[in-house]
Amino acid sequence: MIESLAIWGGVDDGIIGPFIAAIFRPSLQPFMISWMNYNPQIEIAKLTIPVLIINGNNDLQVQVSEAEKLKSAKPDAVLVIIPNMNHLFKEIKGGLIENQKSYNDEDLPITKKLIKTIKLFILK
């Protein structure tokens, strides 16, 4: 799917299933195509301001290794890996099913460790 966006400049949502169509709907495709033109490591290295990189070790969408690549590209950045935090900044103590369910649980709070991390970074 990603390759089709990059190579062909779009995907016809009539040929893909409803779940994928929701993610790759035509209205989002221009954004996704432009987003693929950027390399996060190159972009973060250009920054001349303090940088805080936060990742959860329970993130289904962005692996810790991706945050580590950003840190390598910007050695003076602060990297914090928050235990049990997922992509939605929620603390997940269970496995994959609990993590997936959290995406629809608006009552699950943002992990306090995230808030403390951001606060300390701003105040420093």
What are these model-predicted stretches?
Residues 1-34, 38:
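Accessory cap/linker subdomain of secreted extracellular hydrolases
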Residues 25, 33, 37, 60, ...:
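Solvent-exposed, acidic/flexible segments
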Residues 78, 85-124:
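Catalytic active-site module of serine/aspartate enzymes centered on a nucleophile-bearing elbow/loop
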Residues 47, 53-55, 59:
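Short beta-strand/loop motif that positions the catalytic acidic residue
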Residues 49, 62-73:
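Short alpha-helix in the alpha/beta-hydrolase fold that links the catalytic acid
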Residues 58-62, 87:
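Acidic catalytic loop of the alpha/beta-hydrolase fold
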Residues 34-48:
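The feature captures the conserved acid-bearing segment of alpha/beta-hydrolase catalytic domains
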